[in-house]
């Protein structure tokens, strides 16, 4: 079921227009949520994902990018967005290894349901990384990809916030 949903939602996401305005609105919502936190992992956007990199501009916060190796995510400190490498799954990350304790993780998604579960790309990286972590978990999707479909499985991790360009949903 997830494989077919992923395909349908990716097609839908690829056809979304006015991305720049939507991305800007998403960033405004995220900035309000992360205001009191200092160590935040964000995702370098691929394909048609929302681009939230503008939240790092002029910020005094510490940002990190996920480095995906084999089956795991390793947070890497982001010192300079112009000095990146590609990880094992060909996504941009940082070279700088760190043991810093993250406070917030902002994850991408193909889609998200209103039960606060994300539909990722099928690798389980974020589910394994976030398992048993006491951390603020934010998933970012365009509003068109927020669904009522109950697709989560027992190993899926639920998120604390869903951020779209139209609203912020907080899990109670």
Place the predicted regions along the sequence by residue.
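Short, flexible coil/linker segments at or flanking structured domains
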Residues: 28, 40, 63, 79, ...
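Solvent-exposed, flexible loop/coil residues
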Residues: 50, 82, 93-95, 123, ...
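N-terminal active-site beta-alpha-beta segment that forms phosphate/nucleotide-binding
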Residues: 1-96, 100
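A residue-level signal for conserved active-site and pocket-lining positions in enzyme catalytic cores
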Residues: 9, 42, 63, 106, ...
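Charged helix-capping and loop-helix junction motifs
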Residues: 57, 120-126
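Surface-exposed, charge/polar-rich loops and edge strands
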Residues: 2-4, 14-15, 100-105, 114-117, ...
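Short, well-ordered strand-loop elements centered on a beta-strand within folded domains, enriched
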Residues: 71-77, 117-119, 168
């Amino acid at each position: 079921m997830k494989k077919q949903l992923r395909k349908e939602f990716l097609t839908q996401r690829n056809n979304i227009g006015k991305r720049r305005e939507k991305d800007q609105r998403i960033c405004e919502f995220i900035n309000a949520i992360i205001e009191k936190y200092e160590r935040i992992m964000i995702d370098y956007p691929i394909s048609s994902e929302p681009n939230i990199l503008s939240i790092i501009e002029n910020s005094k916060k510490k940002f990190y990018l996920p480095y995906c190796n084999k089956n795991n995510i390793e947070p890497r400190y982001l010192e300079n967005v112009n000095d990146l490498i590609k990880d094992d799954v060909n996504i941009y990350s940082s070279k700088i290894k760190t043991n810093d304790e993250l406070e917030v993780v902002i994850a991408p998604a193909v889609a998200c349901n209103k039960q606060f579960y994300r539909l990722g790309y099928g690798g389980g990286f974020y589910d394994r990384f976030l398992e048993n972590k006491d951390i603020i978990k934010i998933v970012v999707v365009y509003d068109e990809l927020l669904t009522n479909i109950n697709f989560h499985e027992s190993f899926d991790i639920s998120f604390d916030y869903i951020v779209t360009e139209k609203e912020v949903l907080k899990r109670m």
